[in-house]
């Protein structure tokens, strides 16, 4: 690729980012959200004056939309014109550090506001076609917790359980997610004990409007369960494109293996969109 072509491509990426954020600017009910969070936000009566609530909310939204760490969100806001314009800042002094953003996220989590905001964002994105609902990728990840983890009553949390993955034992919870296959945006998150099998949660992760569902071999049989969503809301049968286990492919004839490997590669390439999501999901589900 030539420098000129690379510059053109970079310009297109910047334009798309700005256009997307312009749509987000229009659809988010800012006044409603700020009023929802304000009672929980720092009053600034002691110590340093807190950053404006709207700045923090906009940073938090960017972090979730673009799957960024606390530090990366701050750096991108300083470096990206689209991000800084969206947050209404024009110098690095107006941008909080990563630790401050992390504390804000935990404040939302502890006050039960995160789920409300997430549900509203998903609904708005769907309504405007930014989440296309043509297909869903389902997946899960273990959220590790210390064995001493306790609930609000100071007792060992009964929702945290032990599970073996490969040759390693893990203790904690499991995050199950449904991701729009076209945009890569998360539309559903379910949290369970770590020992809950992936396939059990499948139907809870679907919108009911999909034409196709993708998942790894942990979801084999999802379309045959009693609680499976067989047809979408238009009556069309949903295709479950679940990856086979490698051992299943090995048992096939040479010609069958070739076709199967090609099909498995196609499924895996679609599922790859889900991998980057888990970094931010893990951050959202921890205190």
Where are these regions (language model features)?
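Charged, often Cys/His-bearing segments associated with DNA-binding zinc-finger transcription factors
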Residues: 1-31, 38-39
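Helix-centered, glycine/charged polyanion-binding patches within enzymatic domains
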Residues: 4-7, 211-212, 217-287
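Secondary-structure capping and boundary motifs in well-ordered enzyme cores
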Residues: 29, 48-54, 93-96, 266
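An N-terminal domain-cap segment
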Residues: 34-54
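Polybasic low-complexity intrinsically disordered regions
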Residues: 53, 62, 71, 75-78, ...
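Contiguous, well-ordered alpha-helical segments that form the cores/surfaces of helical PPI scaffolds
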Residues: 53-64, 279
């Amino acid at each position: 690729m030539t420098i000129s072509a690379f510059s053109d491509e970079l310009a297109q990426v910047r334009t798309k980012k700005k256009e997307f954020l312009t749509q987000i600017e229009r659809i988010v009910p800012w006044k409603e959200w700020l009023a929802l969070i304000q009672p929980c936000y720092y009053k600034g009566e002691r110590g340093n004056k807190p950053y404006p609530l709207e700045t923090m909310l906009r940073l938090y939204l960017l972090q979730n939309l673009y799957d960024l760490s606390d530090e990366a969100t701050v750096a991108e806001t300083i470096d990206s014109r689209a991000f800084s314009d969206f947050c209404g800042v024009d110098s690095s002094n107006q941008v909080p550090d990563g630790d401050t953003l992390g504390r804000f996220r935990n404040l939302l989590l502890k006050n039960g506001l995160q789920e409300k905001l997430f549900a509203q964002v998903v609904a708005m994105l769907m309504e405007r076609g930014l989440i296309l609902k043509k297909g869903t990728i389902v997946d899960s990840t273990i959220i590790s917790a210390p064995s001493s983890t306790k609930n609000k009553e100071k007792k060992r949390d009964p929702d945290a359980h032990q599970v073996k993955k490969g040759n390693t034992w893990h203790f904690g919870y499991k995050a199950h997610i449904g991701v729009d296959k076209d945009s890569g945006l998360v539309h559903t998150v379910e949290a369970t004990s770590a020992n809950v099998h992936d396939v059990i949660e499948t139907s809870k992760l679907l919108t009911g409007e999909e034409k196709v569902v993708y998942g790894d071999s942990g979801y084999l049989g999802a379309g045959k369960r009693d609680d499976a969503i067989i047809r979408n809301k238009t009556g069309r049968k949903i295709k479950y494109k679940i990856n086979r286990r490698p051992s299943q492919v090995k048992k096939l004839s040479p010609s069958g293996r070739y076709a199967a490997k090609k099909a498995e590669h196609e499924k895996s390439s679609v599922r790859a969109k889900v991998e980057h999501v888990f970094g931010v999901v893990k951050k959202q589900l921890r205190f």
